Amino acid sequence: MADKGDQSSYLIKFISTAPVAATIWLTITAGILIEFNRFFPDLLFHPLP
């Protein structure tokens, strides 16, 4: 079993890495949506019949 200090180290590493990974992921997703909307402006909003 890992000792308590080792688990604490992993927790601190996760807490400091997760927001960075989430920010990068959301930035890439937003960029894809923005570029898709730039090339195909009417496809994101489907009109009702």
UniProtKB/Swiss-Prot annotation:
Q: How does it sit in the membrane?
A: Single-pass membrane protein
Q: Which GO terms describe its cellular component?
A: photosystem I; plasma membrane-derived thylakoid membrane
Gene3D superfamilies attached to this UniProt entry = Single helix bin (1.20.5.510)
Q: Choose any GO biological process term that the UniProt entry carries and state it.
A: photosynthesis
InterPro entries named in the record = PSI_PsaJ, PSI_PsaJ_sf
**Superkingdom of the source species:** Bacteria
Q: Does the keyword Transmembrane apply?
A: yes
State which residue ranges cross the membrane: 14-34
Q: Which UniProt keywords apply?
A: Membrane, Photosynthesis, Photosystem I, Thylakoid, Transmembrane, Transmembrane helix
Q: What does this protein do?
A: May help in the organization of the PsaE and PsaF subunits.
The family this protein is said to belong to: Belongs to the PsaJ family.
User: What protein is this chain from?
Assistant: Photosystem I reaction center subunit IX
